[in-house]
A protein has these predicted regions:
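Residue-level structural signal for beta-strand termini and adjacent loop
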Residues: 49-50, 147
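PLP-dependent aspartate aminotransferase-fold enzymes
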Residues: 91-172
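Structural signal for hydrophobic packing residues in well-ordered secondary-structure cores
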Residues: 10, 14, 18, 71-78, ...
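PLP-dependent aminotransferase class I/II
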Residues: 83-87
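Glycine-rich phosphate-binding segment of PLP-dependent enzymes
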Residues: 44, 50-80, 90-107, 168-169
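Active-site-adjacent loop/helix segments that line or gate small-molecule/cofactor pockets in enzymes
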Residues: 1-32
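Active-site and channel-lining beta-strand-loop segments
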Residues: 25-46
Length: 172
């Protein structure tokens, strides 16, 4: 299958929750380190810094080994059960965190983390109004897309009225 066929099937079968930057996005078949490869074997340098993979590199061997080791022991289990990897990671984070940050709450995605942060802030302050940065990206849920000010990253106009967008700081 070539890139054009993949793009066509993507458009046909996937819900358009987020608009793409390009008319013809790269149909990625492989990724290693900071490089992407399309269906035709063309190589591209991945400059997209908004996703965690680029900070450690695609198909990072050390990360892959750790994942395989964990999968061989325990793939997924409800957060209702305590597990050694989770409590060890929480303890490590608490020991690294400044001040009185002594509790962890793990989520499966950035969107879920943003939703949880909003919920915690509203519970703590009693306020329902939110301030989000104009150039921030928060995810694909309704609240997360409302926090996101880029129209191309939203499927719908902002639905949550209590959100105000502030200019992102310019440090240069």
């Amino acid at each position: 299958m070539n890139s054009e066929a993949v793009r066509k099937k993507h458009q046909e079968y996937l819900f358009p929750a987020v608009k793409n930057y390009y008319k013809k996005p790269i149909a990625v078949s492989k990724a290693k380190g900071a490089r992407l490869e399309d269906m035709e074997g063309n190589s591209y340098l991945d400059f997209f810094g908004g996703i965690l993979t680029i900070s450690v590199g695609h198909a990072n061997e050390e990360v892959n080994r750790a994942i395989i080791t964990q999968i061989n022991n325990l793939t997924h289990i409800s957060s209702l059960y305590p597990t050694l990897p989770v409590v060890e990671f929480a303890e490590m984070l608490v020991n690294l965190a400044p001040g009185k940050l002594e509790k962890c709450f793990f989520t499966a995605s950035g969107t879920e983390a943003d939703e949880t942060a909003v919920m915690m802030a509203q519970l703590y302050t009693g306020n329902s109004e939110l301030i989000a940065l104009r150039h921030g990206y928060s995810g694909r849920s309704l609240l997360a897309q409302s926090l996101t000010a880029h129209a191309s990253w939203r499927a719908l106009p902002t639905q949550v009225s209590a959100i105000k967008h502030a200019l992102s700081p310019y440090c240069y």
